[in-house]
Regions:
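N-terminal, post-signal-peptide region of Sec/Tat-exported proteins
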Residues: 42-75, 79-81
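Bacterial N-terminal signal peptides
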Residues: 6-15
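Buried hydrophobic packing residues in well-ordered domains
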Residues: 30, 42, 76-77, 104, ...
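Positively charged n-region of N-terminal signal peptides that target proteins for export
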Residues: 1-4
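Flexible, processing/modification-adjacent segments and terminal tails
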Residues: 20-39, 45, 52-54, 82-84, ...
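Gly/Pro-enriched, hydrophobic low-complexity segments
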Residues: 105-109, 121, 149-245
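Hydrophobic residues embedded in beta-strands of well-ordered beta-sheets
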Residues: 69-74, 96, 106, 181
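Extended lipid/amphipathic-ligand handling interfaces
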Residues: 30, 60-66, 199-204
Length: 254
């Protein structure tokens, strides 16, 4: 009888273990919260602060379309300030390009290069982390979220597997119950902390609760902060031609 009970208990434990999601599955679920599964556009507003005072701002329109393999291709159109209106950035596969209509030239960019404040070029492109990083579960712990509330989280350690990944490694904290992204720390190849980000202000956008703000704090100077706001989500068709470098001079938003 004891052996039967032990066998039954062992089966229960094995079943629970097999049902637990892997770190990679939790990362993919977190991606599904940050990003819609279909082609879409949204407005991205960047605001840079130094010691609590606004020093710069920029408004962009992002067009993102999922590609075979699950990653996104993104076209970014500069809207404000007026001096930058009409400029474009394109991320497709392992290439990123900047196009200036003034001189009608496109130049290759690094995703790691700063766009404004603490936001890099790669930060404004729509990216599924699960396609560029391998995840391992590092800890389960309670942290303070972007609303200064305690949150029980799984800490995932992400290591880059794609050559075009914006960061060498990332520590990502996701809500232990919902897989919502809560906090991230981004590291360079040298393991130097580049920035810390908090995902907050969850709202329903395109059928799911998604973070509509990301607060990015410099890794060396906590007084240097960039706020990214995401709004005006819209599901829409995005022609594949828009996502080709040769088409950039002919791009006209509809």
């Amino acid at each position: 009888m004891r052996s039967l009970s032990a066998l039954f208990l062992g089966c229960l434990i094995a079943g629970a273990t097999s049902a637990a999601p892997s770190a990679d599955e939790m990362l993919a679920a977190s991606d599904d919260i940050r990003n819609p599964s279909q082609a879409f556009s949204m407005t991205v507003t960047l605001t840079e602060f130094q010691a609590g005072k606004q020093v710069d701002a920029s408004t962009l329109t992002s067009y993102a379309r999922p590609q075979p393999g699950g990653q996104f291709a993104s076209l970014i159109r500069f809207v404000l300030p007026a001096r930058d209106a009409g400029k474009l950035m394109l991320k497709h596969g392992n290439e990123m390009w900047f196009y200036d209509p003034t001189n009608k030239a496109s130049v290759r960019l690094s995703p790691q290069q700063r766009l404004m404040g603490q936001a890099s070029n790669g930060d404004v492109a729509t990216v599924n982390f699960s396609r560029d990083y391998k995840a391992t579960l590092a800890a389960t712990e309670t942290i303070q979220d972007g609303e200064r509330q305690p949150r029980r989280t799984h800490k995932l350690a992400l290591s880059a597997t794609a050559p075009d990944a914006t960061y060498a490694s990332i520590d990502l904290w996701i809500d232990a119950d919902s897989n919502r992204p809560i906090k991230a720390r981004f590291f360079a190849d040298s393991e130097r902390l580049l920035k810390t980000a908090y995902y907050r202000r969850y709202q329903t956008q395109l059928g799911a609760q998604r973070p509509t703000e990301t607060v990015i704090i410099d890794g060396l100077d906590p007084q240097s902060v960039t706020l990214m706001r995401f709004s005006a989500y819209a599901a829409r068709a995005i022609p594949e031609a828009w996502l080709q470098r040769d088409f950039l001079p002919r791009f006209k938003p509809d």
